[in-house]
């Protein structure tokens, strides 16, 4: 199995700020990394797949980077609507493996 270590567990930044979330895989997953946004009572929303490809309709304020074992999600120009929990998912032929999540608090 692949262990996905996601940091930080929570982060608080003001509107207009920038948040960086890191995800480390216990073994190489090449570019098999996706990022999701989850809000209470709503299904997870795919933000980025293949490490850096923006999903349809997602703001370009969200940027994914990395390959192998080290990946990063950067959210720039934060908006109140970005307050949510963010998860990484590493995919291999053996299945999908999720990070522990990062709660993003946006201070208005």
UniProtKB/Swiss-Prot annotation:
Q: Per UniProt, which keywords does this protein have?
A: Adaptive immunity, Disulfide bond, Immunity, Immunoglobulin
Might you report a single GO cellular component term? immunoglobulin complex
Task: Outline the segment boundaries, as ranges, of region: Framework-1.
Answer: 1-23
> What other comment is given for this protein?
This chain was obtained from antibody to type III pneumococci and was isolated from the serum of a single rabbit.
Biological process terms in GO annotation: adaptive immune response
Q: List the disulfide bonds.
A: 23-88, 80-108
**Where is region (Framework-3) located?**
57-88
Q: Where is this region: Complementarity-determining-1?
A: 24-34
Q: Where is this region: Framework-2?
A: 35-49
Enumerate the Gene3D superfamilies for this protein: Immunoglobulins
Q: Which InterPro entries match?
A: Ig-like_dom (IPR007110), Ig-like_dom_sf (IPR036179), Ig-like_fold (IPR013783), Ig_sub (IPR003599), Ig_V-set (IPR013106), IgV_Light_Chain (IPR050150)
The segment annotated Complementarity-determining-3 runs over: 89-97
Q: Does the keyword Disulfide bond apply?
A: yes
Region Complementarity-determining-2, residue ranges: 50-56
Identify the stretch(es) annotated as Framework-4. Answer: 98-107
Q: Where is the signal peptide?
A: none
Record-given protein name: Ig kappa chain V region BS-1
Q: What Pfam families does the entry give?
A: V-set
